[in-house]
Design a protein with these regions (language model features):
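N-terminal localization/anchoring segments of enzymes in phospholipid and broader phosphate metabolism
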Residues: 1-538, 556-560, 572-691
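Active-site glycine- and acidic-residue-rich loops that bind
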Residues: 548
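Hydrophobic alpha/beta core scaffold segments
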Residues: 563-567
């Protein structure tokens, strides 16, 4: 347990002991995800889904964050993180914690989920555990579907060690020629386009188990000495030069290079022969500390196949978001522009219907002959999104249509490039983003002629224009036609699409120029008033709290006695509850059915609350290296809605975790005799009651 000395006011607020390492904090977030796979109150297939999410999260963590730490260590660059933990210690801490977590994941699978699935009629079994009838069925599928696509690749004279694609599942083998007594290494890639599990009646057999049982078929006349299942993770991070004059070309080049990034992790079965593992690590250039022995099966992302099974009895009850009363009239969609003219509107997804609000906003703009122009940002979207076809129709109708497609959105670059080309071919004015800055702001603007004037309608969100994630991420959106906010948003669009310095903004806070300064100013304002006897309170909900300047401002506010409550889903880089520094700070995390993605920044002084929502998290990358926007929410009724969201999550005793000053987390429990309060269930209940 870490204890923190009481630093002197202000001068000691940069003491590394007050901060928690980013990478190690993220691993604790993923531990909270894994905990959901153990929760007996969660339906069985949803628990399998959380196993897959945990593994998918971990893959991306290695591809981006671990790769970055390894690169920084190799370059010898001095560490600039607030915690000042040496990179060697960070990597060692990652290795130990990851090994612990993946072993726990394997135990959850073997001891809990696999037996429960069998009880529910979904039996998972290795090939050698099948009945004769089941073996025959799998043999037939192997010959018909699997064997034709397998390609054994041996290593020897004229046969170099094969390229191993990132995140692919493989079998490594040593094969001996009984006549020549020559031993060679060979590799078989488990085909990624085939189902991870093959069905034989009511039993599912892992594909790698089927292939491993049939390796003799691929090496006739040879003796297979040893086999090992293995998987590699490659560096997928990249940076685009600020000087690049062809952003699209630079991104496409980096996507091609990503396939050949250096190996940052080698996973092998925990019973893998040591000499075979050594041969693999030497051939791949992997250090021993980057080799992870893990329980089978490797790669639990394959459980997405199970999680999608049509078993309603083993899944969450479906949630069909009701339509807010202002969204319908006698069951029919209303004129959304007329509704916005009556006053600002706030939507909270998935509790409020994304289709009936955000999609309706764009669709109505396309169909409305009075609309002159539509402008929108697009960071991530889905293949079935109706928004892209709507923008294309708008351009084809002659409306001025502008779409900023962020081609640097990590792991969505290729998808976004395809959307960009489709939009551009249809006459949409497409902007790629800014070199050196990712445009992460979530904005849509509709310019409409009304009589002898032109009015601008704006949607400002915390989440992507993506109907798929809108069903599983919690996000907020503000609709407004306030002239001051609309003018700010128009100026930001012009800054991004044109050639100008970033302007000053009247209402919104925009990164990378003004956002940090604005939020720190609000924190300091509340703190100073509190010192002078005007009671204050700060409430923040975000995905990550890591920025040193913001954290130090919160420490100063805590030293002034301001109660500070934070709901941080993922990375929390500060220690709350430290005497003399952060003792009035309470930091929680909500992890549940929906991924908490909304950002709220609320500052109360003397009973008056000022609040903002928007796209930014409190990280250096968001505040210095992205175009972000947060907007004030001024309407008293909407402010009440925002604070109600915060209050119900602060009262959560079912999904909430709380951070101690020593950096450990504990589950928040209900008081004796009280029923647990699940904030996500409560928000669904409230949404249904409003409809």
């Amino acid at each position: 347990m870490t204890t923190v000395e009481h630093p002197s006011p202000r001068s000691g607020l940069s003491d590394p002991e007050l901060y928690i390492n980013r990478e190690l904090s993220w691993l604790e977030f993923n531990q909270r995800v894994l905990h959901l796979a153990q929760d007996p109150d969660i339906p069985l297939l949803e628990r399998c889904k959380f196993m897959a999410i945990f593994s998918s999260n971990l893959d991306e963590f290695f591809m981006v964050r671990v790769a970055a730490v390894q690169d920084a260590q190799a370059s010898g660059r001095p560490s600039s993180t607030p915690d000042a933990l040496p990179r060697e210690d960070v990597l060692q801490g990652i290795g130990l914690r990851v090994q612990e977590l993946v072993r726990r994941q394997g135990a959850i699978w073997r001891r809990e989920l696999q037996p429960l699935l069998a009880d529910a009629g979904i039996r998972i079994a290795a090939f050698d555990r099948l009945s004769e009838h089941e073996r025959v069925a799998i043999e037939e599928r192997f010959e018909r579907e699997v064997y034709p696509v397998l390609t054994p690749l041996a290593v020897g004279p004229g046969l170099p060690f094969p390229y191993i694609s990132g995140l692919s599942l493989n079998l490594g083998l040593t094969v001996r020629d009984p006549i020549e007594n020559e031993v060679r290494f060979a590799r078989i890639k488990v085909p990624p386009r085939l189902p991870r599990f093959l069905a034989a009646g009511d039993v599912l057999v892992p594909l790698e188990s089927v292939i491993e049982h049939h390796v003799d078929r691929l090496f006739p006349g040879m003796e297979v000495v040893d086999t090992v299942q293995f998987r590699v993770t490659r560096d997928a991070d990249y940076a685009i030069s600020d000087e690049s004059d062809d952003l699209l070309g630079a991104v496409e080049a980096q996507i091609r290079r990503r396939r050949f990034g250096h190996v940052v992790r080698l996973e092998v079965a925990d019973d893998a022969p040591a000499d075979l593992v050594r041969q693999l690590s030497d051939s791949l250039g992997v250090r021993q500390q980057d080799v992870y022995r893990v329980p089978l099966p490797l790669d639990f992302t394959g459980l997405w196949q199970l999680a999608s099974k049509d078993r309603p009895d083993l899944r969450d009850e479906p949630w069909d978001a009701p339509r807010e009363p202002w969204l319908t009239s006698d069951g029919d969609p209303i004129d959304i522009f007329a509704a916005i003219r009556r006053g600002d509107l706030l939507v909270h997804h998935p509790y409020d219907d994304f289709e009936a609000s955000v999609e309706r906003f764009v669709e109505q703009a396309v169909a409305d002959p009075s609309v002159l122009a539509i402008k929108q940002t697009m960071y991530r979207t889905s293949g079935d999104s109706p928004i892209v076809p709507a923008l294309i129709r708008a351009a084809e109708q002659g409306k001025q249509t502008v779409c900023l497609v962020e081609v640097q959105a990590r792991f969505d670059e290729q998808n976004n490039i395809q959307w960009e080309r489709k939009l551009e071919r249809s006459g949409v004015h497409v902007v790629y983003g800014l070199a050196g800055l990712k445009t992460h702001a979530k904005l849509a603007m509709v310019i409409r002629r009304e009589g002898d004037r032109v009015r601008r309608y704006v949607h400002i969100g915390t989440g992507n224009y993506n109907p798929t994630t809108a069903r599983i991420y919690t996000d907020l959106g503000l609709f407004t036609c306030r002239e001051d906010v609309a003018e700010d948003v128009a100026n930001l669009f012009n800054y991004i699409t044109g050639f100008a310095r970033q302007p000053a903004y009247e209402q919104v806070l925009v990164a990378p120029t003004y956002l940090r300064e604005g939020l720190v100013g609000e924190i300091d304002r509340v703190a100073e008033a509190h010192r002078q006897g005007t009671p204050g309170r700060i409430a923040i909900k975000c995905n990550a709290m890591l920025d040193g300047e913001v954290i130090r401002a919160l420490f100063r506010a805590s030293q002034a006695g301001v109660p500070i409550q934070m709901i941080v889903r993922s990375i929390a880089g500060l220690r709350p509850g430290v005497p003399g520094v952060s003792e009035t700070i309470e930091l929680r995390s909500i992890v549940g059915r929906y991924l908490e993605h909304a950002r709220i920044f609320a500052f109360t002084s003397g009973g008056e609350t000022r609040a903002w929502i928007g796209s930014a998290d409190m990280m250096v990358r968001n505040l210095d290296k992205r175009v972000e926007l947060v907007t004030p929410v001024d309407d008293p009724a909407l402010l009440d809605e925002l604070m109600a969201i915060i209050e119900v999550q602060l009262a959560d005793t079912a999904l909430a975790w709380q951070l101690r000053s020593d950096g450990t987390w504990f589950r928040v429990q209900p008081r004796s005799g009280e029923r647990p309060l699940n904030s996500q269930d409560e928000l669904m209940r409230r949404a249904a009651a409003r409809a």
